[in-house]
From Swiss-Prot:
HAMAP family linked: Asp_carb_tr_reg
SUPFAM superfamilies: Aspartate carbamoyltransferase, Regulatory-chain, C-terminal domain (SSF57825), Aspartate carbamoyltransferase, Regulatory-chain, N-terminal domain (SSF54893)
Cofactor(s) of this protein: Zn(2+)
Protein name: Aspartate carbamoyltransferase regulatory chain
Quaternary structure (record): Contains catalytic and regulatory chains.
Length: 148
């Protein structure tokens, strides 16, 4: 017998769908989610395309542009659904921006952003296999450390 569990829909907030499988906890950790906000987390669920995905539903959360960019860096195929009064009022796919400001930490210990507390700035050189370059020290970064 197949049992299907239903998750109560949210009234007002954000649903992040199509998160790359096993990355929802990383997305959750990056967002500044208030402890009083109800959160539903679904890991490794089947998608209509036959692959596995994660889903994150947060009641009462409005994402900033920086939040959306962080999500794009962790899971570039994620979809954001904005919910108001139980209805989807906006739906869009995240996209990796051409410039990344203040989100990623430069891995060069001698970079001015690490020595003098200047906000980091990166240029995205390649999006398919993410390759970014620090605007200050010109170092290419392939392992991304995202600032909270």
């Amino acid at each position: 017998m197949k049992v299907e569990l239903k998750v109560k829909p949210i009234e007002n907030g954000t649903v992040i769908d199509h998160i790359e499988s096993s990355k929802a906890l990383k997305v959750y950790d990056l967002l500044k989610i208030n402890e009083s906000m109800p959160v539903t987390l679904a890991l490794n669920v089947s998608s209509k395309k036959g692959s596995l995905k994660d889903i994150l539903k947060i009641e009462g959360l409005a994402l900033s542009k920086a939040d959306v960019n962080k999500i794009a860096l962790v899971s570039p195929n994620a979809t954001i659904n904005i919910i108001k009064d139980g209805k989807v009022v906006s739906k869009f796919k995240v996209g990796i921006p051409n410039k990344i400001d203040g989100i990623v930490k430069c891995t060069n210990p001698n970079c001015i952003t690490n020595k003098e507390g200047i906000k980091s700035k990166f240029t995205v050189e390649q999006k398919d296999t993410l390759k970014i370059r620090c605007d200050y020290c010109e170092k290419f970064i392939n392992s991304i450390i995202i600032s909270r």
